[in-house]
Curated annotation (Swiss-Prot):
InterPro entries: DNA_helicase_Holl-junc_RuvA_I (IPR013849), Hlx-hairpin-Hlx_DNA-bd_motif (IPR003583), NA-bd_OB-fold (IPR012340), RuvA (IPR000085), RuvA_2-like (IPR010994), RuvA_C (IPR011114), RuvA_C_sf (IPR036267)
Subunit structure and binding partners: Homotetramer. Forms an RuvA(8)-RuvB(12)-Holliday junction (HJ) complex. HJ DNA is sandwiched between 2 RuvA tetramers; dsDNA enters through RuvA and exits via RuvB. An RuvB hexamer assembles on each DNA strand where it exits the tetramer. Each RuvB hexamer is contacted by two RuvA subunits (via domain III) on 2 adjacent RuvB subunits; this complex drives branch migration. In the full resolvosome a probable DNA-RuvA(4)-RuvB(12)-RuvC(2) complex forms which resolves the HJ.
Highest taxon in the source lineage: Bacteria
Species: Magnetococcus marinus (strain ATCC BAA-1437 / JCM 17883 / MC-1)
Residue ranges of the region described as Domain III: 154-204
Domains: entry comment: Has three domains with a flexible linker between the domains II and III and assumes an 'L' shape. Domain III is highly mobile and contacts RuvB.
Protein name: Holliday junction branch migration complex subunit RuvA
A Gene Ontology cellular-component term: Holliday junction helicase complex
Length: 204
């Protein structure tokens, strides 16, 4: 099992990165929260990873902090919660907010995760409530060289839309949010665009 990767950031996108470790490129799937903490391409980077082995694929999931990885593992232990949904949860909320919601059985917050309805939220709270006390939460340890990369304005809207669709938001929701976001003024940074879009998509 690969527990962490330390090397240079060869490429980054809202849903995955390529890490160059001694000349070997590893494709690693990430949350938007981790994306927002990444350094610029070419700089040193550390990701805490989870390895998933399937019959047809060897998949890596990376996180900028230990707490993100712990909550990812916790969420994927729930029956019916896959890696995509766990990444969506970590893209929408901090690990601390998710743990608080689970411990308090806050279904309202859990239902704001893309793809999570009331029944899924109830199952998450029921299956995980007893496990929370055994989950130590260390102080956040972030990826090496954290920085924000300015995106290419020409492809910014398309990249943000792709990231939101991958999280489970519906095309009409994404189109409406991005139309409102970009009509408010010029945005040239993808991190700013993603945060703004997620805020607009969050239930009032």
């Amino acid at each position: 099992m690969i527990a962490q990767l330390k090397g240079s950031l060869a490429a980054k996108h809202p849903d995955h990165v390529v890490m160059d470790v001694h000349g070997v490129g590893y494709r690693v799937f990430i949350s938007l929260a981790t994306y927002n903490e990444l350094p610029t391409v070419g700089e040193a980077c550390l990701l805490y990873t989870v390895t998933h082995v399937r019959e047809d694929a060897f998949l890596l999931y990376g996180f900028h902090s230990e707490s993100q990885r712990k909550v990812f593992n916790l969420l994927t232990s729930v029956n019916g919660i896959g890696t995509k949904l766990a990444l969506a949860a970590l893209s929408s909320h901090t690990p601390e907010a998710l743990l608080t919601a689970l411990s308090r059985e806050d279904l309202t917050l859990l239902c704001t995760i893309p793809g999570v309805g009331k029944k899924t939220a109830q199952r998450m709270a029921m299956e995980l409530k007893d496990k929370l006390g055994a989950l130590p939460m260390a102080a956040p340890t972030t990826a090496i060289g954290a920085a924000t990369m300015a995106a290419n304005p020409a492809g910014l809207r398309e990249e943000v839309a792709s990231a939101l669709l991958n999280l489970g938001y519906k095309p009409p929701q994404v189109d409406a949010a991005l139309a409102k976001l970009f009509s408010a003024g010029e945005i040239t940074d993808i991190s700013v665009a993603l945060k703004g879009a997620l805020k607009l998509l969050a239930p009032a």
